[in-house]
């Protein structure tokens, strides 16, 4: 991929909606926004991929993020250098559970 743009999706946890049990939804909200970005990019022929394995402190420093802003994920945005071949996908039976979790 020739990515001329790399997007860092960030959250502001202290402004997030909070569920009754105290769970802040900032990471979920960022994931929803990132998913929409990936779908829109794919729709116009651009390639993307989620990058969540990064050093948050280094990202904060490079991007000049204040302490109140949390980097959640990155994605490059560009045109694929070549087409990937078909990969084996898991079947629905491998990933969907019915009514109760069972291994």
What label would you give each PLM region?
Residues 45:
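Structured binding elements
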Residues 1-33:
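Glycine/small-residue-rich phosphate/adenosyl-binding loop
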Residues 12-15, 56-57, 81:
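Short, charged/polar surface micro-motifs in flexible loops or helix N-caps
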Residues 48-52:
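Short beta-strand segments at enzyme active-site cores
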Residues 59-72:
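Short, electropositive alpha-helical surface patch
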Residues 36-37:
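Aromatic/hydrophobic pocket-lining residues that form π-stacking "cages" and hydrophobic walls in ligand
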Residues 41:
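Hydrophobic pocket-lining residues that define ligand/cofactor binding sites across diverse proteins
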Residues 73-103:
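C-terminal helix-cap and adjacent tail motif
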């Amino acid at each position: 991929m020739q990515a001329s743009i790399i997007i860092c999706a960030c959250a502001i946890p202290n402004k997030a909606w909070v569920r009754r049990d105290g769970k802040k939804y900032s990471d979920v909200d960022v994931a929803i926004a990132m998913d929409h970005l990936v779908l829109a990019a794919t729709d116009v022929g651009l390639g993307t991929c989620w990058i969540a394995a990064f050093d948050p402190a280094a990202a904060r420093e490079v991007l000049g993020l204040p302490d109140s802003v949390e980097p959640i994920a990155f994605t490059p945005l560009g045109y694929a250098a070549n087409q990937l071949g078909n990969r084996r996908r898991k079947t629905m039976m491998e990933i969907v559970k019915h009514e109760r979790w069972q291994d």
